[in-house]
């Protein structure tokens, strides 16, 4: 591409450099030397700069102009965009363009090289200028250029963030892109978050803005999450999973997300995913907001947001004896995420525990298949089908652990599956889910083993998968888009962080299986496993 551009420019210069009455080719003056007007040229990130130069024989014509380094190769970080003829004969301006790679560079061995128009010699040779310097400080302290938006967080007094419970006062601003708007500085609080992920070197964070803001076109809210994706060599497991979940029309809401760079207290921390927090809100999980007075009748029936998580770290939690989990066998751990623990009344807790118990007892009872007396009177079946498909297509075994699994119930309504969350641990990996090569990952997860014993449920599940398949088959193209979008971010991120350190939290074994691969090889593997899932799943339904 670079070479062909130079040839076109050179062809234009042949006409520009020749006299009006062209001499025979054999009599053309020959370029014998090239002089540059400056020994140093600074280019701003993403910009260009002009370097004037002259040729000794002002009537000389030439075929090609390019930039060459001492080794004879063309530079990667910048290129020759165009040549503009000067006012005087034999004078020109070279427009040199930054390649947009986001790198610092400082080359002092750059030459303008001209291929003369001299058919009398059978060999191509370039006449080169003396060496000159081209430099750019793409990443001065506290800045980064990868093509992604940059989130800047500065804590009060430069304090460190060491707790998942205690907030630190801070300010936040965003440098946008052509696609995404930026944000002027606003006040916020920030703390750590996550279970296992909090104990890795690259930390995830929760941000609480003082005032609701719309970030990157997502609905206004105060609370936002910065996922570190530390162990994900592809940097796209969560991104792709949320894309798949957004295709599911029976899931009420899927968190919006945008990959960003994080600069914390002036230090670039790497590639992050800014994502909406799973939280009850008119623009997120839209169940009825409760008060401590909602204790009887229809008022006590909702809304609730529940998390199923074997880590058992919710403040209000219990285990229902029915169902299957991958950690200890029987029983499902439930936690109440909404109402907040300080607002949840004993009557409300008794109601939702009773509803879960009645649902599970019916599901595991003799009449569970009955369309009127069975499980269908308690759960929104379509949402449970779509939720399972997302986990199964992505090979996410967390549904069966269970971990970061959500359900919600609105006032007067049934139990609804979702939203989807936290798809970085073992997703699309044969390391954590070897059964994915030939079978289902979540065939027996939580309540699904029992649900699939109902032929009507299994038929609906199969029909829904086949209906969604054309959409699901577009995801590899989306992965290609993400790969292009994240390439430079990945280069900088993995110069700072080693995802193979995730083995420290997994008995010495890497989790996803691609931690020691290159970014591009890891993406190719992710895409290959995804395509295999689309082939394997239909045969097992």
Language-model-detected regions and their locations in the chain:
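Middle-to-C-terminal accessory/interaction subdomains
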Residues: 186, 194-196, 200, 334-401, ...
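Internal "kinase-insert"/substrate-recognition segments embedded within catalytic cores
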Residues: 208-214, 221, 228-230, 250-255, ...
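Extracellular acidic, Ser/Thr/Pro-rich low-complexity tracts
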Residues: 55-59
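Aromatic sugar-binding surface patches on proteins
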Residues: 86-97
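C-terminal motif of bacterial Sec signal peptides marking the signal peptidase cleavage site
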Residues: 14-17
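Short, solvent-exposed loop/linker segments at the N-terminal edge
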Residues: 41-47
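Bacterial signal peptide processing site
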Residues: 19-21
């Amino acid at each position: 591409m670079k070479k062909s551009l130079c040839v076109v420019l050179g062809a234009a210069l042949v006409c520009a450099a020749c006299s009006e009455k062209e001499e025979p080719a054999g009599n053309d003056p020959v370029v014998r030397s090239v002089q540059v007007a400056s020994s140093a040229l600074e280019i701003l990130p993403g910009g260009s700069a002009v370097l004037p130069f002259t040729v000794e024989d002002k009537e000389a014509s030439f075929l090609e102009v390019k930039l060459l380094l001492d080794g004879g190769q063309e530079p990667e970080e910048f290129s020759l965009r165009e040549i503009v003829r000067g006012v005087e004969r034999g004078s020109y301006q070279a427009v040199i363009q930054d390649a947009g790679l986001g790198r610092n560079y400082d080359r002092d061995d750059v030459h303008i090289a001209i291929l003369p128009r001299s058919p009398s010699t059978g060999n191509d040779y370039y006449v080169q200028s003396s060496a000159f310097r081209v430099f750019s400080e793409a990443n001065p302290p506290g800045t980064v250029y990868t093509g992604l938006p940059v989130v800047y967080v500065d804590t009060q007094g430069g304090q460190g963030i060491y707790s998942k419970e205690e907030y630190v006062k801070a300010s936040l601003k965003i440098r946008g892109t052509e696609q995404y708007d930026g944000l002027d500085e606003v006040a916020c609080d920030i703390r750590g978050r996550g279970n296992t992920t909090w104990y890795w070197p690259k930390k995830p964070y929760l941000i609480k803005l003082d005032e609701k803001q719309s970030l990157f076109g997502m609905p206004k809210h105060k609370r936002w999450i910065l996922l570190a994706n530390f162990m994900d060599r592809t940097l796209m497991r969560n991104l792709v999973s949320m894309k798949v979940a957004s295709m599911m029309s029976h899931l009420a809401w899927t968190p919006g997300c945008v990959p960003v760079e994080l600069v914390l207290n002036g230090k670039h921390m790497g590639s992050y995913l800014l994502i909406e927090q799973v939280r009850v809100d008119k623009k997120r999980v839209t169940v009825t907001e409760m008060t401590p007075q909602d204790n009887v009748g229809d008022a006590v029936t909702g809304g609730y947001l529940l998390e199923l998580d074997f880590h058992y770290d919710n403040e209000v939690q219990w285990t229902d004896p029915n169902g299957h989990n991958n950690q200890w066998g029987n029983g499902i751990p439930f936690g109440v995420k909404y109402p907040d623990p300080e607002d949840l009344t004993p009557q409300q807790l008794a109601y939702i525990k009773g509803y879960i118990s009645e649902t599970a007892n019916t599901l595991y009872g003799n009449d569970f298949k009955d369309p009127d007396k069975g499980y269908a009177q308690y759960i929104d079946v379509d949402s449970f089908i779509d939720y399972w498909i997302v986990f199964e297509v992505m090979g996410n075994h967390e549904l069966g652990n269970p971990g970061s699994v959500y359900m919600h119930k609105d006032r007067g309504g049934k139990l609804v599956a979702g939203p989807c969350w936290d798809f970085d641990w073992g997703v699309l990996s044969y390391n954590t889910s070897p059964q994915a090569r030939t079978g289902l990952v979540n065939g027996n997860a939580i309540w699904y083993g029992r649900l699939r014993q109902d032929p009507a449920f299994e038929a609906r599940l199969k029909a829904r998968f086949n209906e969604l398949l054309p959409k699901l088959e577009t995801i590899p193209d989306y992965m290609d888009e993400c790969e292009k979008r994240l390439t430079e971010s990945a280069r900088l991120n993995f110069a700072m962080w080693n995802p193979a350190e995730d083995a420290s939290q997994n008995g010495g074994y890497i989790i996803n299986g691609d931690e020691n691969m290159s970014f591009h090889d890891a993406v190719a593997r992710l895409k290959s496993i995804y395509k295999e899932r689309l082939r394997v799943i239909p045969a097992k339904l």
